[in-house]
Amino acid sequence: MKTSLSKQPMGYIIEGSLTDGFVMRVAREANIEEVKAGKFVAIAGNQYTFFSMITNLTLQVTHPDILLYPPSDGEHFLKEFLKKNSIYATAQVKPMIVLNKEGRALPVKTVPQHFATVYEATERDVAAIFGCESDRVKKYFNMGTPLDMTTPVCIDLAKLAERSSGVFGKSGTGKTFLTRLLLAGLIKRQAATTLIFDMHNEYGLQARQESNAKFVKGLKSLFPSKVAIFSLDPAATMRRGASPDVVIQLSYEDVCVNDILSLQSELNLHSTAFEAAHLIHNKYKGQWLAALLEQGHDAKVFAEQIGAHPESIAALYRKLKRIEQLPFFVKKLPHRESVIDRLLEYLQKGIHVVIEFGNFTSTFCYLLLANIITRRIHSEYVLKTEKYLGTQKSEDEPEQLMIVIEEAHKFLNPIAASQTIFGTIAREMRKYYVTLLVIDQRPSGIDAEVLSQIGTKIVAQLSDEKDVQAVLMGAPNALTLRAILGSLDTKKQALLIGHAITMPMVIETRTYDEIFYEAMQDPLMARPVQQVIDEIF
């Protein structure tokens, strides 16, 4: 697709370099207050169109003495004279991608000539670069619009699902809203099946908007036949207006020693306590937790039986005894089929699963449940992948699965990432058809190796310098993007970077409202019944 340039020039390139970007002199006719950091512009070269982002603005004068005697408010003639001859503004412009005359996108490897004209990018340019939802081949999804524009910026959902992704931003910037938007796109476009660990009950049935008391639809409300709710607290789910599809109940046998490793920081357990847990497991196998909770009260006697230190047994018993207070944990299940088997059945049918925690919102509960379920699912997907590699039959190829976790730094900090299943999944990338979508306000708390495997990042406003450095680690043009991040509004703006988007882009995020709900409907369901009947017959 060829590009088209808007009629009114924004400015002209006067200097610059490939590594540092270009300097644009803002045109005299342009309104400087409409030239903003993060704005998407096109530089018209002879052979290429350079699509770029404005990263900084500077006021300039032709001679410093002009600043010694600035005109007063009433000196309009002098102001106009200076504006035409002596004062001007420049903008730092960073090229992100070029299009040749055939409309093919290429990396930036050259520079435009002096005085190349800079235009505001057009709607046609945006569609050429970022794709369109109407594309029948690629699974594009509209995430929002460029600053001061109305044309959709799309991400490639198939590429998004191929690698782990992240939604980052400080508290109150709308991370949950961005995630819900993204998940709705994945469900609508059938790009991947999702398993969502919903700690605060914000993705299933409904959720309250952060800015006011209004409620918005959850994924189950938008896609009733495509989303199932598994609940730890069925009473809480029913209070919000629906019965869960499955009530979660787990046995002590479902807990393995490695599941407890991720709780080391949360429980403040010494490494000797985990050594004791392994000793218990060596003797009691799958009944290790039941044995600890039954006999751990007499730590000295129990420690002698298994060859552990009494203080380690006592500490482990004290910390894990709270499991007995969780009503969804039982010593032995009353039936053979486990809830994880049922969950796998739903996922294999392409049904997205939201696990609601209800009133059980402690970090202990969230970490434990997420580890137990994800470990088992990952094992199943490893077996499925190995079978597919052996048979090479298309019907044996697993469907792509994306696991969604909040408070990701608690699963993926430098200690936990090397020991837990979530660190394994993040490092394996798409090897076994399982990826992560991590949501966090503290990306600096996530292990650096894991962060380097995050393919696509959707970043809302961040204020901590460590978090900014972490989220931009490994990104091209990191210095440029850091300036852009600093200019984001608190709400409804985000920076898209990475594997699923053609070039880094600042967007005004799509509004999650009645118009969005209608867009998510099946086209057949959105039309009147009589119209559908008339078309068929």
Predicted regions and their residues:
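Loop/turn-to-beta-strand initiation segments
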Residues: 191-195, 349-352, 398-402, 432-437
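Glycine-rich phosphate-binding loop of nucleotide-binding enzymes
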Residues: 138-231, 496
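Conserved ATP-driven motor cores of ASCE-family P-loop NTPases powering translocation/secretion/packaging/pilus
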Residues: 83, 426-508
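Substrate-engagement module of ASCE P-loop NTPases
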Residues: 186-188, 376-382, 422-437
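Conserved P-loop NTPase motor module
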Residues: 491-537
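Basic- and hydrophobic-enriched, low-structure N-terminal and domain-boundary segments
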Residues: 1-168, 177-182, 395-397, 418-419
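Sensor-1/coupling segment of RecA-like P-loop NTPase cores
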Residues: 193-203, 208, 388-389, 429-443
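P-loop NTPase motor domains
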Residues: 201-213, 230-424, 490-498
